[in-house]
Curated annotation (Swiss-Prot):
Nucleus keyword on record: no
Membrane topology of this protein: Peripheral membrane protein
Entry's localization field: Cytoplasm, Cytosol; Endosome membrane
Gene expressing this chain: chmp5
Source species taxonomy: Eukaryota, Metazoa, Chordata, Craniata, Vertebrata
Protein name: Charged multivesicular body protein 5
Family annotation (Gene3D superfamilies): 6.10.250.1710, ESAT-6-like
Source organism (scientific name): Xenopus tropicalis (Western clawed frog)
Amino acid sequence: MNRLFGKSKPKVPPSTLTDCISNVDSRSESIDKKISRLDAELVKYKDQMKKMREGPSKNMVKQKALRVLKQKRMYEQQRDNLNQQSFNMEQTNYAIQSLKDTKTTVDAMKVGAKEMKKAYKQVKIDQIEDLQDQLEDMMENANEIQEALSRSYGTPEIDEDDLEAELDALGDELLLDDDTSYLDEAASAPAIPEGVPNDSKNKDGVLVDEFGLPQIPAT
């Protein structure tokens, strides 16, 4: 069948704006190179004309320089046109890419909105409120347990004012306890005489009572 009707040629994909921009920029660079060569020729003819006297030879060189200059102007015009085309295509390409980016962003936002709707459907406000109530009840129970465990047994309530008054009085008592002057007074007091008043001794030096009988020492 291919021999009778021939084989169909593969379809060539259409060129994109990026390909067109690259092609135009390449042509513009090629023209720039041609302009550079023409500039070099103009410099050469200019130097020749400076060294030549007026006459047919100089006029001939001048005509060559004018032709080169005319070509240069034409190339410059072509280059400017290509640069403008490239700029316009770049602006168009930028606008297209911006629209694509915008569409991608909108599509992503739509997907996000759908996901959020699904997530909201799975979340029940009533369940959240019930859970909060349960947590609150458990915290209250925990506090009651802690209060029960820390309860004191048989400890009377103490007034803070009474404690402060006792503390102030305790300070005065401590100051009195620290005073040791009573010890000095006791040391300087006269000694207690031994024996009983009006006691006397016999000739042997033994204490006798008022009847002259020896006294029995206290045990």
